[in-house]
Amino acid sequence: MPRAYTVATAALTLDVSAKWIDNALSHHRIKGVRQERQGVSRQLTIEGLLTLSIARMLSAELGSSVGNAISIAQRIIAERGKMMLTKGLQIELDLESFREQLLSRLEHAVEVAPLPRRGRPPRNTTGRLE
C-alpha cells in the first residue's frame, strides 16, 4: 500500500488552503485519495497529490473549473503526459519533471506539517496535577 499524506501536508505541498483541498475532495472523486466514513481523516497518495497539483495549475492558468481541471489532470496522468483532443489540440506536460518538483515540495511539507490531533482533548487542560 503506497504511503499516504494528510490534508494539511497536501495543502502545504500545493500551496493552497486545507479548505480548498477538502472542497475538491468533497465534490470530486480522485484516484489516489482514501476517503472513509465520517470522522476518519482523508489521506492522499502521490497520485492524488499529482492530480490535484496539475488540476490547480490548469485552474489557475486556464481559468478552468476545478471539476474540469481534475478530469483533465486524470487524463493527462493516464496518458503519460500527453492528451490529444479533437481537431488537433494537444495538451502536453513533462510529467516526470512535474512529479520531481512535487516530491521536492512534499519532502519539505512533511517536515513542517503538523500531525493532526485525533480524539477527545485531554481532560486536564490547566497543567495542574490532581
Question: What would you call each of these model-derived segments?
Answer:
Residues 1-24:
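Polyanion-binding surface elements
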Residues 1-2, 56-130:
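Basic Lys/Arg-rich amphipathic helical interaction modules
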Residues 16-42, 76:
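Major-groove DNA-recognition helix of helix-turn-helix-type DNA-binding domains
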